[in-house]
Amino acid sequence: APAAEPVKAQESAKAAEIKKEEPKKEEVKKEKFTVDWDVSAAEKGGYEHFMMKEIEEQPKAIRDTISPRIKDGKIVLDDISLTEEDIKNINKIYIVACGSAYHVGVVGKYVIEKMCRIPVEVQVASEFRYCDPIVGKDDLVIVISQSGETADTKAALEEAKARGARVLSIVNVVGSAIAKASDDVIYTWAGPEIAVATTKAYSTQLTVIYLIAAYMADKLGKISKEEYADFIKEIESLPDKVAEILKSKEDVQYLASKFYNCHSIFFIGRNLDYAVSLEGSLKLKEISYIHSEAYAAGELKHGTISLIEDGTLVVALATGKNLFDKTVSNVKEVKARGAVVMGVTTEEHEHMDDVADYTVKIPATHEMLLPSLTVIPLQLFGYYVASLKGCDIDKPRNLAKSVTVE
């Protein structure tokens, strides 16, 4: 027994030496993020559904996204490190996103190309990451995600960075994975969005796209001082104009009561109206489960018009001045084949009343900003149709708020 004691002593000494040799663990420094959200924003506050609450919160959400970024009549994007020289050296812009955020990207393509004269390509994130994209160090990739955790969008971001591109993200959730992985991030101050079908996050993403487009156009010298001032004035008026549309929501509710039993509903438009048609169609089908498709109005004659029959509802968006007559011509085509038409247009286009069965009017604004107004009656229409059908509006079947799987 006494002989075992020296052995134990040796083992204890060795253990002590090993402990001494163990490297010190580095202290993990956690990054702190301040999320300026009120608890009441995550409560229904008397509304039957979060979706309607969030639709009605859009004037405030847009205003909150604009106000810190317009100072003394100029757009100030302190969020990003892009210099004037960086902007001038951009070869091409890619906008990559999924779902409604992708539809924001389609609007972004029209607006940025028109205002900045830089080529823009829009791609669904799940396609971008696998298509061996031709993107490099002179390109800017804009990724859009409400949650900042969308799996396909995050993977597309990583693909873009691996190829040397600069990545700017538009995100709602502070400190999210996409925000942290980007070179620059612009946050949309929409607040928490609980309903699966996005409304206010979509609208604030649009707002950020407008700000980016005007900011870059100014740096590139593609916009006059007068045009720039007018554009900013119109951006600042968007919250009030959205609120004005919301005051007439009962008119849209009436239309929903006439069409909630439809089996198929088609949305058509040209240019920016086509981009909003995509969102209107998605909003309707994801919460009401009615089959719906959106088409560029000029494509009707290339196949889609064969689906039109007596009683088919066609929602025709015609807000742009230059293309109004073209879209009216398409309305006449579907009417001749038995369609019922709900037109969405601006107050100045009185001729729509003569050709459509029903008309929804929105206030006039700068042509590039019209999507922010056109989408509101489409959100309301989708909501009221789903409500009349008794659907689970806030949590539609088979859908998730944040898609974190591929």
Model segments located where?
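Intrinsically disordered, compositionally biased charged tails
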Residues: 1-25
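Intein/HINT protein-splicing elements and their conserved insertion hotspots or analogous self-processing inserts
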Residues: 21-64
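Generic C-terminus detector
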Residues: 32, 40, 340, 353-355, ...
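Extended hydrophobic-aromatic, low-complexity segments
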Residues: 64, 104-106, 121-122, 151-154, ...
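Glycine-rich phosphate-binding loops that contact phosphosugars or nucleotide phosphates
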Residues: 88-237, 317-360, 381, 389
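Short, conserved micro-motifs enriched in small and acidic residues
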Residues: 99-103, 199-206, 271, 275, ...
